[in-house]
């Protein structure tokens, strides 16, 4: 007799659970208090098992619209931000009351891309989250919609869930949605689409199946979840994408039951510092490399020398994070640059021995040192 597979969540001591808007709101009529209480009860059960849980929850804008009496989602950014500000009050109150029923305290954490892009703020957020977890508090995380603009948005709570997973070095990321998990095609369009129960995070076939980087929605909005799992895998975290409509899905996963799609972390695990560099979603520029430089980075573990750079794109300063791309524009690495863009343009295609002659001085022989870059291919 073959034993049933055990969910990767069963052994997770620290995990991040992301709950989408449809799982905490009442069809556009604000928060569903019963649903909020349901999630609180499950997380409380995990706490009793000695597990640490961070909850990434949507729902602020929907709650704000309900409180303001708006039936139609506004298109003006400042009105959306106002709705988020109003709704965050209700979201926090609902979770605070629900967790209090189980003797647990909650904390609100609102993050922006700039919080995570700045190294000092990143470390402060990390330390605060660790402190809350040690205290037995349940952190409830959301993007700070009240202050962000389209240019600096994290983008979605799937991405935020992965970033928080990396931030606290969680063992697992659980992305709860209104679908069963991943399919080989959109099940809403193809009822015969095959369900995927297990796969490897970072499998390029999954991204292609979901429509690729330019597809927008992809198969049922799954592309962002696949990319989030890939991001989380680089800190060693497994990801489960499952339906939040499943009864007691969190506690059942923790008991070892296989629900949804498991994406196992088989990618190289990055150090915390390299994870921070990789998690930059807003890059300051790009360096286009020749084939020799690409191979030196990918296969030889070398630093990036100016002679291997054929083009400098964007305006950036020394110490900014920029991407390294091949001639086709595909990113292969990213990291901290030793020279501002103006100087990088002057020394590109030149050997390091000529840097002093060109610039008058030499900060470093490399444009990007191998200790300050991370392979992202």
From Swiss-Prot:
GO terms for cellular component: cytosol. Substrate binds at residues 58, 145, 157. SUPFAM superfamilies: Carbamate kinase-like, PUA domain-like. The keyword Ubl conjugation does not apply. GO terms for molecular function: ATP binding; glutamate 5-kinase activity; RNA binding. Belongs to the glutamate 5-kinase family. This is Glutamate 5-kinase. It comes from Bordetella avium (strain 197N).
């Amino acid at each position: 007799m073959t034993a049933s597979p055990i969910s990767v969540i069963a052994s997770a001591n620290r995990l991040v659970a992301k709950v989408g808007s449809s799982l905490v709101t009442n069809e556009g009529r604000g928060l569903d208090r019963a649903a909020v209480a349901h999630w609180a009860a499950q997380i409380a059960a995990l706490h009793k098992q000695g597990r640490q849980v961070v909850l990434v929850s949507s729902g602020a804008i929907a709650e704000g619209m309900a409180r303001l009496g708006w039936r139609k989602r506004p298109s003006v950014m400042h009105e959306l931000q106002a709705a988020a500000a109003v709704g965050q009050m209700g979201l926090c109150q609902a979770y605070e009351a629900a967790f209090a029923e189980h003797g647990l305290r909650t904390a609100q954490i609102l993050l922006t891309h700039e919080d995570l892009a700045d190294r000092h703020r990143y470390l402060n957020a990390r330390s605060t989250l660790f402190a809350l977890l040690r205290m037995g508090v349940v952190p409830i995380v959301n993007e700070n919609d009240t202050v962000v603009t389209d240019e600096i948005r994290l983008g979605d709570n799937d991405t935020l869930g992965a970033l928080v997973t990396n931030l606290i070095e969680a063992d697992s990321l659980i992305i709860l949605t209104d679908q069963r998990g991943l399919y080989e095609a959109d099940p809403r369009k193809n009822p015969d689409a095959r369900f995927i129960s297990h796969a490897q995070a970072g499998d390029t076939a999954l991204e292609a199946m979901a429509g690729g980087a330019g597809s927008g929605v992809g198969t049922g909005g799954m592309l962002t979840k696949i990319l989030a799992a890939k991001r989380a895998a680089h800190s060693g975290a497994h990801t489960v994408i499952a339906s939040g409509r499943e009864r007691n899905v969190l506690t059942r996963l923790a008991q070892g039951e296989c629900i949804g799609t498991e994406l196992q972390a088989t990618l190289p695990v990055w150090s915390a510092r390299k994870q921070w560099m990789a998690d930059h979603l807003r890059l300051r520029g790009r360096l286009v490399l020749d084939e020799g430089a690409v191979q030196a980075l990918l296969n030889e573990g070398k630093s990036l020398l100016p002679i291997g750079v054929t083009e400098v794109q964007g305006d950036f300063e020394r110490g900014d994070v920029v991407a390294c791309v091949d001639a086709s524009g595909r990113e292969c690495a990213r990291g901290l640059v030793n020279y501002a863009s103006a100087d990088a343009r002057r020394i590109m295609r030149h050997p390091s021995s000529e840097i002093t002659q060109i610039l008058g001085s030499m900060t470093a022989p490399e444009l990007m040192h191998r200790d300050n870059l991370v392979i992202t291919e």
